[in-house]
C-alpha cells in the first residue's frame, strides 16, 4: 500500500513515500528534500546472531554517480568501493541510531541509504540520516525513538538552517545536530574558530529545529508504521549472574581501585582465570555469560566510583589532565615532525610538503574540488599492545583522520601565502584514550616544525560523561582515558585554538545529552585546551622561519593566460623539456599563475628564466642577444626569445653596405639586435645596424 507524507522544513518540502518500491524489504522508502532523493531500505535477521557480545548494526551509504548525471571514470565504468566521504557519512548515520536500540538486541540489522538524485543546495547525507531513522521507525524492528538531523550554518553571526551551497560557502560554521524530542544524540562540527557561547547557541538552534522533523516521523509512525515485534534480548542467566557476583564482586571492586594500569590489568587477568576455573564444571558452555557478568561488574564499580565517590580510576580530579610532553624535529630527513604524549596516549605526526599538483582531486557527488591539505591517521595494533593483522585503513581510522584534519583546516595558510600541498600522517604509538585529539596536537607541532605559517596553534581534548540509569545525575570529566571511555556514556571531542572552536565530534552510548551537559563539556574543554596549548607553545612557540633543508622550495611567476598554451607546448612537449632539463616540478593555474617547486635554487631559477623567456612578448625598441638560425640571400633570421624569431634584412646587418649575408654572420652566431617594428601579421623586424650605431655613439660620448 502506497503511503505519502510531506512537511515544510526551512522553506523546502521534506517528502516521504513508502510502499511503492522494495516490496521484500522490512521497510523501503524514498525520502526527498528539494530535488535531493535518497532511497532507504532496512532489514533485520529473524533470530539473534549466536556467539557475539555486540549489536551487529550495519550502515551502508551508497553514492550513485547517476544522481548527479555522471558516468563513473576508470576502465570499469561503475561505482567501486565506498569513498572516504561515504564511509564518514555511514559512521555519522550509525552514531545516533545505535544507542536507541534495546539493550541486549543481537539481531543483524542493515540500513542501506542509496543516493538517487542530488541537488547541491540540499545535502544527501543529512537526508539519509533522517531517512534511516524514519525507515527504522516505520519497520517492525524494535526501534521506537525518532531521531532528526539538521545542518546549521552561521553567516555574520546569524544561524542558517540547512544552508544552501552558496550559504555554506559563506558560513563560518558547518554543524550537524542529531536529536530526539528530548536530547541531543550526536554532534559533528567544523568551524572557523567559533567562540564557545556561539557554538552552544548554534547547537540549541539545531536542537529546536529538529523537533519539527521528530514530529513528522512520529506522525508517519502513527499513520502507517508497522507493529513492532517483541525482540529476543540477550541477558546472562540469572544463576550465573548471582554466582559470579557473589564469588568475584569484592575482588573486582578492589582491583578496579588500583590506579596503576599495568598492575590493574594483571590482577584482572588473574581474577578472570580464577572465575573461569571456579565455574568450569558448573557452567562448561556458558563462557560468554560469565564474561558478560564480569564486564558488567567492572562497569558498575567504575561508574559508582565516578558518580558517587567523585573519584577517577587513576586518581585524577574530574578536571585534571594527564601529564603532557611535546617534542619536535625528531626525524632528520622529513620536512617536519611532532611527538605529543598525554599520559599513556602518544601520537607522532609527520609533515610532508609537495607541489600544488599533488593536491587530491575529489570527484564525488558534490562540486569537484581539490584538497591541498590532507591528514591521515594510522592506528596499528601495537599501540594497544595487541597482535593483529596489518591491513588498509579501517572506518575508524578514516573517521579519526578526518576529524583531526577538520580541526586544522581553518588554520592552514592560503595557496597564495604558502603554495604547497601539505600531507600530515599521524602514527598512534600508544593508545589509552583520545588519540584523535592527540593527533590534532601532534599535527600542530609537526606543521610548525615544518615551517608552515598556520594562523594559530590548535589543540584537542576529549570530555567524558557518567550518568545515573534514570539520567537524573551526571558528571562531566576532562581528558578521558581508556577505562572512562570504555565504561562511560559519552566521548565529546573538542578541538580549537585560544580564539575558538574549529571542530567537534560527539558520540553517546545513552539516550542523548542534556543542554547542561553540552554546555559544561564545551566550557570545560576550553579550559583544558588552553592548558594544553601552553605546554605545546613551550615546546615550539611559532612556525619555523625556514623550511627543512630537504623540503622543496616554491617559486611563483605570473604569465598571461594566452601564453599558457605556449608554455605547455604541443602534447606538453615544451613544459616537459623544461622539467627534464632543470629537474623541477611545475604546476600551472588557469589564471596564469605558475608554481615552480625545487629543492635546488639554481635549478628553480633556470626554470623560471626559461618560462619567462618563453612567455614574455618581444617589444619594439628592445635590444636582444639573439641566435642566427637561418641565412637567406635577403637577410638572416634570428631567434631573440625561445620560439620567437625575427628577420634582420641584409640592409640592416651592418653600418657598411653588405653584399653577402655570409660575410657578416653565420648560422649559430649570437648577435645583438634591436626590434624595429612588428607588422600586422606579427612578423618581427630586427636591426643589427641600429645596435652598432648606438654602440658607436656611446663610445664617442665616453671619449
Curated annotation (Swiss-Prot):
SMART domains: KH (SM00322), S1 (SM00316). Residues 552-611 form the KH domain. Signal peptide: none annotated. It is found in: Cytoplasm. Coiled coil: none annotated. The keyword Protease does not apply. This is Polyribonucleotide nucleotidyltransferase.
